[in-house]
UniProtKB/Swiss-Prot annotation:
Gene designation: petB
Major location category of this protein: membrane
Keywords, in A-Z order: Electron transport, Heme, Iron, Membrane, Metal-binding, Photosynthesis, Thylakoid, Transmembrane, Transmembrane helix, Transport
Known cofactor(s): heme b; heme c
Gene3D superfamilies (UniProt xref): Cytochrome Bc1 Complex, Chain C
Further facts: Heme 1 (or BH or b566) is high-potential and absorbs at about 566 nm, and heme 2 (or BL or b562) is low-potential and absorbs at about 562 nm.
Source species: Synechococcus elongatus (strain ATCC 33912 / PCC 7942 / FACHB-805) (Anacystis nidulans R2)
Subunit (UniProt): The 4 large subunits of the cytochrome b6-f complex are cytochrome b6, subunit IV (17 kDa polypeptide, PetD), cytochrome f and the Rieske protein, while the 4 small subunits are PetG, PetL, PetM and PetN. The complex functions as a dimer.
Pfam families attached to this UniProt entry: Cytochrome_B
Official protein name in the record: Cytochrome b6
Location of this chain's protein in the cell: Cellular thylakoid membrane
Amino acid sequence: MSKVYDWFEERLEIQAIAEDVSSKYVPPHVNIFYCLGGITLTCFLIQFATGFAMTFYYKPTVAEAYSSVQFIMNQVNFGWLIRSIHRWSASMMVLMMILHVFRVYLTGGFKRPRELTWVTGVVMAVITVTFGVTGYSLPWDQVGYWAVKIVSGVPEAIPVVGSAMVELLRGGQSVGQATLTRFYSLHTFVLPWLIAVFMLLHFLMIRKQGISGPL
């Protein structure tokens, strides 16, 4: 076993990385409220795992979306549990994200030199809300359908480009299969990659600059 470890140690310098992580200074004023960002990340990882599991059974078509969700809930082993965890962790992620934003703002964590850390955090907050909007539509029940219709119609109030934005979101003049396909693509591919990039930037900057001091 030691030979295997030595082989990886020689190439990856695992010990140096471990020492760097374990020796990072943590300010004495840090309390439980500074864990809200980590809890948000944990919720996202749960979302990723449970969402990935459901993609094996979910069918993103207007004819089969609702029935596939019912199949997950009633026929798939522990499907009801996986979807319930996905649903409740989504709500928890939004709540923890809001509390995290408030904590950072109230403790001045957005001030120089951490402006870019704050910006990436705000971008991730917007992405998180977008996750909720797109995911809400995927069961394609009455609530999901009308939610999509209302949300996708909001940009129409924007001068000049409003109508074009609505058509882009819906994939046509009305809500239908193209709309569901777009929302499914956003929810399962575009947004996860996007938030992963901003998370990496966010964590690298926190790692570089450290936790902000007390007010």
